[in-house]
Amino acid sequence: MALTRIHHINFIVLDLNEAMARFEKVLGLDSFEVIDHPTRNAKVARSRVGESWLVLVSPNDAESAPGRYLEKNGEGFFLLSLGVDNLEQRLAQLESDGIDTVDAGSREGILDWRVADIGALHGAVMQLTDDSLADTEK
């Protein structure tokens, strides 16, 4: 149930193509993989950075969760997701420790990732991710 790594860092953006070009130029990233994320009504682009992913999220709809976040907070850092070996066990441990989470359980992320939003810590939205069912490249 230990944390395994920084799984991914999300940035919320208005224009996905513009953001990809900017992140590639400024950070020297090779390329982004663009993926539809229908359960969040967003389009995402991800690029590998060491053992982690840098993810850009562009809402398709202002009423989606990412759309509401963008409207309230503007573009920029969105969330930090930490990898775990067993998400369901970790959520059960948090519950038994009396720690409330945003999500009642895990939900589907992109590419077979299982995720759960655990709320904000000192202003940063935090999430846990279990990608043990995903292909190792995912």
Task: Annotate each PLM feature.
Residues 16-17, 40, 87:
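Generic non-transmembrane alpha-helix signal with a bias for helix starts/N-cap capping motifs
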